[in-house]
Amino acid sequence: MLCIISYIKVIIAPKDEKNMGNNIDFTVDYKKLDILEEYNTKDIKYPLILSIPHSGTVFPEEFLRAVVPDVMTLRKNEDIFMKELLEPAYKQDEIATLSLNIARAFIDVNRAKVEIDPSMFYNYPKDELGLNQQRSRFGLGIIHKVTADSEPIYAGPISYKEVEQRIKKIYDVYHNRLKKLTTAAAEKFGFCLVLDCHSMPSKICSIISENPRIDICLGNLFEQSCPNKISFFVENEFSKREYYVAKNRPYSGAFITFNYCEPRKKIHTLQLEVNREIYADEKLLRKSDKFQQVSYDVSKVITSLAHFLLDF
């Protein structure tokens, strides 16, 4: 895992210097890409679906030739090692899980399609709606404009037609599958919880609370996305393991938490955020010596939640 090249599964080609400052055009061969990975979805054993949208490490090689930052810098936009952190929950305890393989810096599936900055494109349609919300204004909409270090990803305007392909080939594929899984679980058990799993930068946690440090954030749209009993159960399970838990700060939930919450259909959502500092070196993108323990603890909380939901 310390070998970055093999881990991200890309061939790094030379930068295309002719794109510097000009319109940037490239075409991705999506047939080369494995978009999703899923586990335990043929026979869903619990009314719980894990969504891991930001842990992907695969960059299309055409994209890498066209952008400014190197791979290490681009990877700082992802939720490092989050999929691997939860591995015991889906490989040993058989929790149904959907994970995106594609890197977040290429497309962010935890955003609405309209969270887009029209100024990024040289051919943005005049009649197309672009909801330039706070995240897209900061460069972190469905298509990231900047890295986590606020460095520009592109040296010039990009093609909106190319981005439409990203949405069709990756974004829609992820959400169509997640929708089917949540519907299947709800039909089988009478209800379903989508646990949207993320990691958060330690910097924002320390801004909000230096003492005690926020280890875990649970986002439930300020008590709107799931029954309080579920949030309280997860909070207590982490607290028993001596993790400090905050609710709805710094994050109350994003697109998946909001969009998949359908109380009338008894489909609920909860966003889980794990402070990266407690399991990894954020700057070097390496696991710390605490990784295995945190992985064990977080996965056990998820498994306990799965059994709790069976009797809910």
Language model regions located:
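N-terminal catalytic or cofactor-binding beta/alpha core of small enzyme domains
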Residues: 21-194, 199-312
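Acidic, Ala/Val/Gly-enriched low-complexity intrinsically disordered segments
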Residues: 10-17
